[in-house]
């Protein structure tokens, strides 16, 4: 389950050019919702590529999300509001030669993708986590290395948001 809809396993990737690739895999089962208040548009819609999770966009009549945890009574009835009942487990991968500290930074940045795709994320009822790994391959060099790591982390956040939406879209 993802909120009140069926969860699933999703993946996404992005070619950054020059041999640099980022990818994400997500097992999606959060207590939070992946949909906007209309129940159809994914929170991750701004990051969608080529209609990969339905191509739905918010309409002009979209009601603003004012309720931080909608459908509480239904979530309680389905026993979703219990510690350990939900989680979103994620891994992001990059094809660059990152150090352990840089992988940690990329994982920290990729957490933003989870928060972009699920509302709310990281609740006391979730065990949300993001791991990062590197396949080596592309040498970043030392010139502007922090900038490259920041770009990779940002791209990982975007692909993770897509992977989460794809997991739910393919399951429903």
Spans of model-derived segments:
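A structural signal for small-residue-enriched, beta-sheet-centric alpha/beta enzyme cores
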Residues: 1-172
């Amino acid at each position: 389950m993802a909120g009140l809809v069926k969860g699933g396993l999703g993946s996404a990737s992005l070619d950054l050019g020059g041999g640099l690739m980022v990818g994400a895999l997500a097992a999606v089962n959060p207590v939070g919702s992946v949909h906007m208040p209309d129940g159809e548009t994914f929170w991750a819609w701004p990051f969608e590529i080529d209609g990969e999770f339905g191509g739905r966009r918010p309409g002009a009549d979209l009601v603003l999300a004012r309720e931080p945890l909608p459908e509480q009574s239904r979530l309680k009835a389905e026993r979703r509001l219990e510690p350990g009942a939900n989680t979103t487990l994620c891994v992001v991968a990059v094809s660059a030669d990152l150090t352990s500290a840089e992988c940690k930074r990329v994982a920290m940045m990729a957490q933003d993708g989870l928060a972009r795709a699920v509302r709310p994320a990281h609740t006391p009822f979730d065990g949300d986590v993001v791991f990062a790994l590197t396949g080596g391959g592309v040498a970043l060099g030392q010139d502007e290395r922090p900038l490259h790591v920041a770009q990779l982390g940002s791209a990982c956040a975007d692909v993770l948001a897509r992977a989460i939406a794809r997991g739910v879209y393919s399951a429903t």
